[in-house]
């Protein structure tokens, strides 16, 4: 071994001494850190075990309480359903008792035409009607037609309130239903998903036919009382008029219509027994009875009390009639055929006697689908709102003075 090699070995040995000392200190440091981590991990495990035990204890305490709360909730729900059923039953019983024993009306009524049990006064019959407004117009022609859309079934009603907001639309689908659709404006009704824009108003008793009317914030409609048409009993072939407050959603008045032996007034619309109408003069009812099963009858109603003020036997036949409406105290009856063809006003009756049959126009309706299930006149717009085999249609009317010649 040469002197250079010995020198190199001595240098390497001098370097290895400090490196071994540093490695020893590093190992001791790592061992201390690992011991600290193990201690903290043990503490975390102890805390987790303690928290898990506390959660189990809390769960064991809460489960019985939740079971008790669920049982109490079910008991309250059952009790609420029972109370609701009792309230509904009481309301029906009170409503029936009111129709059977109404308060005496504060009007003078001819004893010969006094209503029977549950009815209000029948009023004067076949006397000339005294107009309360200066309305003196009659139809000259049905000028135009606009089909809005198709909504609902073949029979129904859509209308506006002639005394309410000018834009609001009311839709009553079907002949035996209890839910009306209310649209804020006509544009909402014409949308593809119109039902989503509508609010729903549910009435306490289903209506009969398509003779409903919205007037002055109220929904007027006919319902079958116990023993009404098709139900047997002493009220066979009678109907009850309901006055329903649309905002409060309550029945504010009701009365059995003072006519016995009611039959459908329109030969082509068998589901409607009383067809309510509104014009410049107020509230009217079109109906028919077995006493004269060939012609229509007209009644003037008090919208506040549902009293029948006057009644008339009209010369308008029931056969092939499909709908009717009133303008300025004059009844206009629309006739058609089966299968449906082009409808036409073929009979009119002026309760005031101003418009004679010779001066009355008998216009045709524009060509359209199916047959009219309902027609509603809006005196503010001078338009007809028609339900035609599921289509909602607006007819614009051209007017003239009653005294003018055709």
UniProtKB/Swiss-Prot annotation:
Disulfide bonds join 135-328. Residues 1-21 form the signal peptide. The keyword Membrane does not apply. PROSITE patterns: OLF. Its main location: secreted. Residues 134-401 form the Olfactomedin-like domain. The keyword Signal applies. Transmembrane segments: none annotated. InterPro entries: Olfac-like_dom, Olfactomedin-like_domain. Glycans are attached at residue 248. Residues 22-101 form a coiled coil. One of its GO terms (biological process) is signal transduction. Keywords: Coiled coil, Developmental protein, Disulfide bond, Glycoprotein, Secreted, Signal. It is found in: Secreted. One of its GO terms (cellular component) is extracellular space. Belongs to the OLFML3 family. Secreted scaffold protein that plays an essential role in dorsoventral patterning during early development. Stabilizes axial formation by restricting chordin (CHRD) activity on the dorsal side. Acts by facilitating the association between the tolloid proteases and their substrate chordin (CHRD), leading to enhance chordin (CHRD) degradation. May have matrix-related function involved in placental and embryonic development, or play a similar role in other physiological processes. This is Olfactomedin-like protein 3. The gene is OLFML3.
